From Swiss-Prot:
One Pfam family it belongs to: CHD5
Spans annotated as Disordered: 193-214
UniProt protein name: Protein get1
Transport is among the record's keywords: yes
HAMAP family: Get1
Localization terms from the record: Endoplasmic reticulum membrane
Lumenal compartment spans: 1-4, 132-155
GO CC annotations on file: endoplasmic reticulum membrane; GET complex
Subunit-structure text: Interacts with get3.
Length: 214
């Protein structure tokens, strides 16, 4: 049953990725990808990004302009700022309702493709053995637990296989995170040490010898 074994592992991996990155981050990524294609909201989303860039540019210029020394220029930038802000709010409100519907649809499809599919597989193949244990290697209670709830005694049930996949994926994920964190910490420490050495050398070179006391 290699195909079913791999399917269960893949579903559990997808569930772990969703839980790791978060549903909101995935929804935002899919929303941006959706608007890259010629969809009904792609034009509005593009205009909103353009308005946001113009708004940030005008806001930066307004903050860099003195309202006392250059009042005329500041007042003009202020009017542009308020106008772009109103346009940006209107564009955002019109897209928020569409994005809310999009997020609900994506969340439903994501649940059906991960947790829903896992529940369906566990129900449909609950009486089927994933693979068989070597006879006589495990005591009766261990065989009963591994075949729980309805798989043949002496076999691995789909529920036990799913739990094993989840445990392995979690262990590998934690190990990878620890290795990456250790590597980044080592690099940061080495860079900090290299920056400290020239500072110490410069400080020692500028020290003036004091008078020795007898």
């Amino acid at each position: 049953m290699p195909s079913l074994l791999f399917t269960c592992f893949l579903v559990q991996l997808l569930i772990h990725l969703v839980n790791t990155f978060g549903a909101d981050a995935i929804n935002n990524l899919l929303w941006n990808l959706y608007n890259m294609f010629p969809t009904p909201t792609s034009q509005s989303a593009g205009e909103q990004k353009k308005l946001k860039r113009e708004f940030m540019k005008v806001r930066h210029e307004m903050n860099a302009t003195s309202s006392q020394d250059e009042f005329a220029k500041w007042a003009k930038l202020r009017r542009q700022h308020d106008k772009l802000f109103d346009q940006l709010e209107k564009s955002k409100s019109s897209l928020d309702s569409t994005k809310s519907t999009f997020d609900s649809s994506v969340s439903t499809l994501r649940w059906l493709g991960t947790n829903g599919l896992r529940m369906l597989l566990q129900f449909w193949f609950s009486k089927q053995a994933m693979f068989w244990l070597p006879k006589g290697w495990f005591p009766y209670y261990a065989e009963w637990l591994l075949s729980f709830p309805r798989a043949p005694l002496g076999s691995i049930s789909i529920q036990a296989w799913t739990l094993a996949c989840a445990a392995v994926i979690l262990l590998v994920s934690d190990a990878l995170v620890a290795v990456v964190a250790l590597a980044l910490g080592t690099q940061t420490g080495a860079k900090a040490k290299k920056m400290e050495e020239p500072m110490k050398a410069g400080g020692q070179g500028t020290e003036k010898p004091g008078k020795k006391e007898l």
